[in-house]
Amino acid sequence: MRILILLLAVTQLAVSSPVITRCFHGGQLIAERKSQTSISEFCIKDDVSMLKSEIVYTKNDTGIFGHSKVFRHWTITDWKACNPVVTAGGSINVIEVDKNLNLVTRNYVCTGDCTITVDRKNAQIIFQTDKLNHFEVTGTTISTGWFKSKASVTLDRTCEHIKVSCGKKTLQFHACFKQHMSCVRFLHRSILPGSMAISICQNIELIIITILALCIFIIMIILTKTYICYVLIPVFMPIAFAYGWAYNRSCKKCTCCGLAYHPFTNCGSYCVCGSKFETSDRMRMHRESGLCQGFKSLRVARRLCKSKGSSLIISILLSVLILSFVTPIEGTLTNYPTDQKYTLDEIADVLQAKTHEDSTKYYIILYTSLFGAGLTIIFAGVALGLTIILEVLTKINVIFCNECNMYHSKKSIKYVGDFTNKCGFCTCGLLEDPEGVVVHKAKKSCTYSYQINWVRGIMIFVAFLFVIQNTIIMVAAEEDCWKNEELKEDCVGPLIAPKDCTDKDHKTYLSEASLLATAKKITQVDAENVEILGKTMESAIRVIERQKTYHRMHLLEAVFLNKHCDYYKMFEHNSGYSQVKWRMMIKTQHFDICALQANSPFCAQCIADNSCAQGSWEFDTHMNSTYSSKVDNFKHDFSLFLRIFEAAFPGTAYVHLLTNIKEKKPYQAVSMIEKIKKKFPNNKLLIGYLDFGKYLLGLSHASTYELQQRQLDKLYQPTELTRSGGQQTSLANSVVGQATKECKKYKDVSCLSPRFGIPLEDLISCCDQPNYNIYKKPKKVYKAHDKEETWCINDQHCLVDFVPAEADTVEKLKPMKCWLVDPGKNDDVYSIAIKTCRVVDKGVCTVNSQKWNIIKCDSGPLYYSDHIPGEDTGNDIGHYCVSAGCKTDRYPINPDVVTDCVWEFTSRKSQYIGKISMQSLEDYEKALTDRLTHTLETYSFAPLENLPHIKPVYKYITAQGVENSDGIEGAFITASIPAAGGTSIGYNVRSKDGFPLLDLIVFVKSAVIKSTYNHIYDTGPTISINTKHDEHCTGQCPSNIEHEANWLTFSQERTSRWGCEEFGCLAVNTGCVFGSCQDVIRPETKVYRKAVDEVVILTVCITYPGHTFCTEINAIEPKITEEIELQFKTVDTKTLPYIVAVNNHKLYSGQINDLGTFGQMCGNVQKTNSSILGTGTPKFDYTCHGASRKDIIVRRCYNNNFDSCKLLKEETQLIFNDDHDTITVYNTNHLIGELAIKLILGDIQYKLFTETLDLQIDAKCVGCPDCFESYSCNFQIVSNIDTICSLEGPCDTFHNRISIKAMQQNYAVKLSCQKDPRPSGTFKICNREYTVVFHTVAKDDKIEINVGDQTSFIKEKDDRCKTWLCRVRDEGISVIFEPIKAFFGSYFSIFFYIIVVVVVGFLIIYIFMPMFMKLKEVLKANEKLYLQEIKQK
């Protein structure tokens, strides 16, 4: 009883305990399958869910089966709310399961509407949506996440090259701050607030130079406490000497001590010579008595070495000197004859090609040398000979009448005494003038019409001779062969070959067959098939030998010999390309009889040395006895003879020989051999070989010789011209069909030519007899799903027209034997209807000029759909109904009829920042005042958009041209500029006499080296492994393990043992576990390969006040226009990497596998479309279970070195436009070279200009102080004369000279203002002042946005100011006092002026007053001397 209670308690405990499951509990079943091959268990996570597999094994009479199930658990529960679709390059990675339970990774995007904006003031990217959506930011800043209303990402790098994705939108842009942000990021991570960090970093150079000066000063103070400080004596000695020299000559002496005047201090104890005195009187006496040795410079130098003031000065100078040669931290950029063997079949073609090549080269040289002389001789001979011949021929038609001095036609002429009935009428058309006013003079031109007729007739006759020449030659010897129904010995190839061979190189198989068709020997259908002979003699001979009927073989052989008309003509000699094969066989393969009867004359001369000089042979009785006793030797020699004969005479001759042997009448072939011998009597080796063949054919063994199967295949197999299926029907009344999309009673038409059996197919018939409509046969036809006895092309919707047959084709088939065959049924995707599918794309397409709603399923087909967006079947994510409510079956539409599709779900393509140029300043002001900081466009004032952000440094340049009394005619300037993006130079153009003419700015807007790359594959880390495995209880592993394409196989034997066997398996140390595997990767990195070579493009802009233009130039050719001439003086291009990788919108280069290569480096697992490629040796393990199948654990399948991708070099100097399928890579930071510029200025009549005049000016300026845009001004200037004037403004103007023309009124000027010019400012134009209204827009943009191919403000600033000292100069000392002044206001000015007064007073009292007093004493001394001189006089 106690045992029973215990068992019940254990059972209850087991029932109440929850079942422990792997990975997660529950989940949605998305796929299952029963199969003898099982998958491995897995637990894997993607961006929106987790997946796991479960396998349960069952056994029945047919074997052990695994029931595999795959479950999904959603981690983003409402992920479907974003309406996801599969999109290449999508930001959401989802793992799906196909019908074979293989894991497949796909990229999705949400299709919900998402708005992407850029807040330039706060340097943020803002995303807004109405429902669940997903965003991703990649590039220099990386961020991703889900949101339902609003999200933002802050930018904090100096220059951001990023790709922003949200929903279906993808935006790519380049954003740069006004200052470098590395310092701000470093300080902002500390306790400092953001505003303070920005203020510190704006003046970082000044702060650092101050800190460096203090550090050096502290070190100097420490050194002054030691003797080391005296190493500076050489530095201070020149200063001390100069001070001593000035001390003795420039300073007034104190009346008490004799030293330099010191009004505010007591007299000292030390003299300048170093002596010490107790009282000032003794020192004065020492000075006045001349005992003082003078100023001691070394003593002063030693004091300076110990002085703190000198240490401070040296520290400041050293810090300035050091940092003047150092690039600012903010501006630094961190960079991290063939040897070939031929077969005997190919050697004829190779030899002929070599011979033809050598002959061609010889004749080219020969004809080129004789061309000039030959033309002269030919033309002279033709001119002379043609004239004589035409005169003779003309006399046949025309006579010259001496009575009337005219030419008369002989036709219908009658003589009347010495006159004719045509006297008075000449062949030239002139009548005799009865009055004698016009006197006809006989000329040769009177007979020109007859001469022209004769020339026309001669040309037609010559052309006719050329046409019939080959026809006569070709058909003369073959007159009877075309009529034969079987092969005769007179019609074999060597005997019907042309005797003459001309114009061989211009002959083609088709042209020769056309001549036969013209001669009515064959039909045109036969002639059109001769191109099956191919392009080489080897292929042609093989095609001829494969023919199974005499007519076909004879036809092809005749065409072949007519084209290669010298093929058998070479047999008249002892060499030639057509004899190489059989001669090589004789040389390399020997008859057995010659080994047994080596002394035989035939063997000694023909076989041993290939001379065969004797010419006739008698085969002795020794050969007879040998062959009679040794049948095997006869079979060998006879077989070798046949092979050599086939190599020498392929085609009909060889078939004729084999036919006689097969019919046991080999002796009947002797007459054919005799005729061949007579045709080629000079070919000694051939004669000897044929004589030996005659001898073999005459032996008794030849009648019993059995042909081999290969030889039997060469024989003809005549068959009746018929077809295996279909009904024979006469198509004599058939007609060409009319264009139609539906074919009633469709039948396939198959015809044979009546004589040679050449098939005429690829035709169909529609309608009933006898007037069949004939059409060209389409590739595939389908029976319409909604109409009886109606057939359609390509699909079941009848959307494509049947193409009518050609009229001449219909005429050809009328005399032929034809059969009508019922069409076969096409069981493919176009005959299968569906209700649901996984939709890839949905949109509107044009189908036969009509707009249809089309969807594209993941299996590939297109369907017409009235699908309601968002209607999901619920099976799994991505499955949608094809028809509304899944009520109607739909058949696929062939994509050939679908055009102009506008897909709603497209692959992700990047958008770029738009550029809008405003022609009107009012429109530009509106764009700025509307605070369009969140828009994805940039606005610019068109006349000034080609200027740099920062005013360039101006240089003086002299205008060249022709000087005249008014100025310069055809003025121009020449200069050179570095070909680097962002480079700008201003030019003050002056005349040769120094008169300022105008200002212009040359700006290299962009200088790029670019190339296009194509996407070749994706790679990434392995996140799972697809496996399929099976096991055998006993036996060995299969030699060939079945596996899918691109899967690797694995196996292990002796896996069955006690406690480790499947159901019903009792085995030890035997059995096998085997299977296949494939990696599943997360496609994180895209790999691209260069498609085109690099292109260098330079955009140069020229801007005058009132006129601007840009032009592009490449590195290959100069650019010349009416306004400018550009040419590269030097070019230094840079090669872009051949293969690059893109990960998180960053570009990498290095050791990357190309498509199809799998080295141990980045990219050795490659995903292309839906295929995964890779190599490796799988490593697997298994876990044993008693009476159950083993669990297979695949630890590695492919060799995946994705970690090496993380070690690739990031190409920070390169930017790119990413469109997924292609990328365009730009190098915008390379100095391409030096560019020479010539600007055409036109005529400048500056000597007639006036500098001072009154103008009617209406002006307005719009902009913001200390911002990216600065101020843009538009001047409406009305003037009656042309002049050039100076231009000054309240801020720094980009142009200081303006050319005013009477025919132009609009002028644009850009100003750079650090402060607000207030409501109005004063411009000075032509020495007259004008008040201009300023419209200041309150803007505090922190970032500047563009597409990245043009230079930014920060880059121009770095290029302009490349040292610390330059930055300190630009920042100025005033930045230290700016915060104080802003706090105290006007009181700070009062304090500042007091400090200035104190400093100036100090300088006057201690420096200038002693010097003035000394000057006063010198003047008084001179006055005393003057008075003394007067008294003495």
Curated annotation (Swiss-Prot):
Q: Where are the transmembrane segments?
A: 204-224, 309-329, 370-390, 457-477, 1388-1408
Secretion signal, residue range per the UniProt entry: 1-16
User: Can the keyword Iron be found in this entry's annotation?
Assistant: no
| InterPro entries the UniProt entry points to | Bunya_G1, Bunya_G2, Bunya_nonstruc_pro_NSm, M_poly_OrthobunV
Provide GO CC annotations from the record: host cell endoplasmic reticulum membrane; host cell Golgi membrane; membrane; virion membrane
Taken from the record's topology, the Cytoplasmic segments are: 225-308, 391-456, 1409-1433
PTM annotation: Specific enzymatic cleavages in vivo yield mature proteins including nonstructural protein NSm, Glycoprotein C, and Glycoprotein N.
Q: Which GO terms describe its biological process?
A: fusion of virus membrane with host endosome membrane; symbiont entry into host cell; symbiont-mediated perturbation of host process; virion attachment to host cell
Give the positions of the site Cleavage. Answer: A477, E478
Question: Could you confirm whether the keyword Signal appears in this record?
Answer: yes
Q: Which residues lie on this side of the membrane: Lumenal?
A: 17-203, 330-369, 478-1387
- Glycosylation is annotated at N60, N624, N1169
Entry keyword set: Fusion of virus membrane with host endosomal membrane, Fusion of virus membrane with host membrane, Glycoprotein, Host endoplasmic reticulum, Host Golgi apparatus, Host membrane, Host-virus interaction, Membrane, Signal, Transmembrane, Transmembrane helix, Viral attachment to host cell, Viral penetration into host cytoplasm, Virion, Virus entry into host cell
* Role noted for this protein: Glycoprotein N and Glycoprotein C interact with each other and are present at the surface of the virion. They are able to attach the virion to a cell receptor and to promote fusion of membranes after endocytosis of the virion.
Per the record, the similarity remark reads: Belongs to the orthobunyavirus envelope glycoprotein family.
Summarize subunit and interaction data from the UniProt record for this chain.
Answer: Glycoprotein N and Glycoprotein C interact with each other.
User: This protein is called what?
Assistant: Envelopment polyprotein
